[in-house]
């Protein structure tokens, strides 16, 4: 569900409606517009009923510490159930987060302090995702998994296999992607989609 760029009452209604229908996993990030500011108030009174995941694009220990506390404050929560390195894409990303005083040092400290329960990452590079799982015992990987990428482009099977071998939880993003947007396609109905979504079964 989308809660950014809408007024608080609409965001809260969407969240409550989702919870009423059994949805209990919510994923947000500072880069998602004002989603943190909208989701925080919407979860008041029901925070203990949901699994709340957040992300950071910061790559240094200090940067993560600062952004983590900002996100906790915006979301009005004492902890995140899952905190993730956001958009791990390049070799430089990998080197930055794993070096001394890199992001992972902050993640480990935050887990020890009870500010986060699980440590994960999101990635759009199969190579980087697999390397990361070899370098650290992550709890989860958030990765594009859909019929088009997986079966037509062979993008994903290696990540899934590595995650299974390492005991890393798999979370799918872009699961409803059908194809890339055609040149000049009308995107007005799906302004926030980076791809043509599946609209029916």
Question: What are these regions, as identified by a protein language model?
Answer:
Residues 1-10, 53-63, 91-96, 187-199:
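Active-site mouth loops of central-metabolism enzymes
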Residues 5-18, 61-76, 124-133, 201:
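Short, acidic/polar
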Residues 88-201:
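Beta/alpha (TIM)-barrel catalytic core signal, keyed to glycine-rich beta->alpha loops juxtaposed to Asp/Glu
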Residues 23, 77-80, 116, 138:
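A structural motif
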Residues 72-95:
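Active-site groove signature of glycoside hydrolases
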Residues 19-20, 39-48, 69-78, 132-136, ...:
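Acidic (Asp/Glu)-rich catalytic clusters
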Residues 18, 26, 39, 52, ...:
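Conserved, mostly hydrophobic/aromatic
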Residues 1-50:
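N-terminal binding-site loop/beta-alpha segment at the start of enzyme catalytic domains
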């Amino acid at each position: 569900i989308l809660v950014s760029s809408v007024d608080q009452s609409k965001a809260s209604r969407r969240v409550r409606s989702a919870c009423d229908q059994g949805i209990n996993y919510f994923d947000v990030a500072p880069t998602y517009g004002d989603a943190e500011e909208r989701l925080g108030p919407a979860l008041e009174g029901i925070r203990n009923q949901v699994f709340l995941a957040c992300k950071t694009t910061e790559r240094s220990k200090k940067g993560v510490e600062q952004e983590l506390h900002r996100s906790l404050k915006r979301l009005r929560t004492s902890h995140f159930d899952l905190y993730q390195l956001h958009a791990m894409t390049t070799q430089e990303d990998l080197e930055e987060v794993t070096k001394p005083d890199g992001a992972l040092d902050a993640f480990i400290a935050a887990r020890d302090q009870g500010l986060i329960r699980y440590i994960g990452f999101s990635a759009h590079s199969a190579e980087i995702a697999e390397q990361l799982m070899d370098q650290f015992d992550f709890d989860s990987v958030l990765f594009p998994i859909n019929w088009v990428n997986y079966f037509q482009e062979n993008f994903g099977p290696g990540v899934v296999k590595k995650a299974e071998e390492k005991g890393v939880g798999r979370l799918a993003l872009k699961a409803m992607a059908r194809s890339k947007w055609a040149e000049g396609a009308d995107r007005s109905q799906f302004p926030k989609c980076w791809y043509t979504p599946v609209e029916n079964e």
